[in-house]
Design a protein with these regions (language model features):
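Short N-terminal edge-element motif at the start of the domain
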Residues: 206-216
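Bacterial N-terminal signal peptides that target proteins for export
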Residues: 1-11
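Bacterial N-terminal signal peptides
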Residues: 9-21
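Sequence-structural signature of the catalytic-core scaffold of metal-dependent phosphohydrolases
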Residues: 152-208
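Conserved ATP-binding subdomain of kinase catalytic cores across diverse folds
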Residues: 28-43, 49-83, 88-167, 214-403
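Intrinsic-disorder/low-complexity coil detector
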Residues: 22, 30-32, 186
Length: 403
């Protein structure tokens, strides 16, 4: 089935091999109010033509709906550290690591938030790849990995075959990487650049306290600009900054991204945010993440004219360094259903191994045992509700496609 034909089939709610479960009374999953209005024309075109992009864009609405669907179970479910937006295209590799990345929506809440999100992404991926007969088997592989990690959190998982394939895709020299990054920077006013410089000076003081081995001048800014990337994070303010790095020589400069944290207030089954919302992102990346950036830190309030024009200062933001070898998976990278099966198992292991770690870093065996029992009891319902939620999502996507 061609991509266009598949999208037409999805739009009608049917595709070869799919057993439909009708959407519930809410009928559709729409973006948050105002989100479409601030989306760029290019992004809007992508949302209208790609159901997976739409899935990524409506994560907040999706999570809220998951909380509603499983409201009767929430009281008995343990609170876990969540990825918050776990899906197939969050799988990424660097030269020495692989796994789910991008913890912008990390929070604390019931583990089934991550489970349902990842299963939903599998369902959309098999529809796009015409692999729907393998959907239940792929769900099985995810649950196998998740259960394995709950039982043996230090067991790990084998490297998926696609990792080496992704690493071999157009490797870039550092010079090419830096040039590419500068091409992504969009102009900022002098006042805004000055605010970024002051903010980075504050970040430097914080990072040096934790990493005193970094050389002086590491955070000296060479250039900065607005960054317009992402799907789920497209409405967040983002700044890309070139800094001096290990030495004054331009060849070893670093790129760091400063990103605004989006509020999760109002999502019913997530824990209330702290006074420092950036901490949920930092803790999620450190506890669940396998890819370890050189720089990962919270930032101070930035008073940037362009952001103030939108009605608020850039109060809650964080920075992360970019790795030249970083490569994210796209659905088009999947060579076979076996690739997807290996990623599903690996993601299950990653999420299951660390989701029930408490604030002190403990992985209490009794908590993991209870989580295994609940997972077994709820697994069939989780599968069925995931498919129903995807049907609701596709109804919302079809609505967006209609001018």
């Amino acid at each position: 089935m061609t991509s266009n034909a598949l999208r037409s089939a999805l739009c009608l709610g049917v595709a070869t091999g799919i057993v439909l479960i009708g959407p519930s009374a809410s009928a559709q999953l729409r973006p948050e109010p105002g989100a479409i209005e601030v989306a760029s024309g290019d992004l809007l075109d992508r949302l209208r033509t790609d159901p997976f992009a739409y899935f990524r864009f409506v994560n907040r609405s999706w999570t809220t709906r998951v909380c509603e669907v499983f409201a009767d179970e929430m009281r008995d479910l343990p609170i876990a550290r969540l990825h918050g937006d776990a899906h197939v295209e969050q799988f990424a590799v660097t030269k020495d690591a692989w796994g789910l990345d991008d913890f912008d929506d990390s929070a604390r809440g019931p583990a089934l938030v991550d489970i349902v999100r990842f299963l939903g992404s599998i369902d959309l991926a098999v529809r796009q790849g015409a692999w729907t007969p393998s959907r239940e088997t792929l769900f099985d592989r995810f649950f196998e990995g998740y259960r394995k990690a709950l039982a043996e959190p230090d067991a790990g998982s084998p490297q998926p075959g696609i990792v080496d394939h992704l690493r071999a895709q157009a490797p870039r020299s550092r010079a090419a990487f830096l040039e590419w990054g500068e091409m992504k920077m969009e102009p900022m006013t002098e006042a805004s650049v000055g605010a970024v410089v002051a903010g980075m000076e504050a970040v430097a003081r914080s990072v040096y306290a934790e990493q005193p081995d970094l050389p002086p001048g590491y955070f000296t800014i060479a250039r900065a600009g607005w960054l317009r990337l992402g799907v789920g994070s497209a409405v967040s303010a983002k700044i890309l900054i070139r800094i001096q790095g290990p030495s004054p020589a331009p060849e070893d400069d670093e790129l760091v991204e400063a990103k605004e944290v989006q509020s999760l207030i109002g999502i019913p089954c997530l824990e209330a945010q702290s006074d420092q919302p950036t901490l949920r992102v930092i803790l999620g990346a450190r506890q669940l993440g396998r890819l370890k950036p050189t720089i990962l830190a919270a930032g101070p309030e930035l008073v940037i004219p362009e952001v103030l024009a939108r009605g608020r200062p850039l109060r809650d933001w964080w920075i992360r360094s970019w790795d030249p070898s970083y490569r994210e998976l796209g659905l088009s990278d999947l060579r076979s259903v076996q690739d997807l099966a290996e990623i599903a198992y690996d993601a299950g292991v990653q999420l299951g191994a660390h989701s029930v770690v408490d604030q002190a870093g403990s992985r209490d065996a009794s908590v993991r045992t209870r989580e295994l029992a609940r997972l077994t009891r709820l697994e069939r319902r989780i599968r069925d509700e995931t498919l129903r939620l995807i049907e609701e999502l596709l109804v919302g996507w079809k609505e967006l496609r209609v001018p």
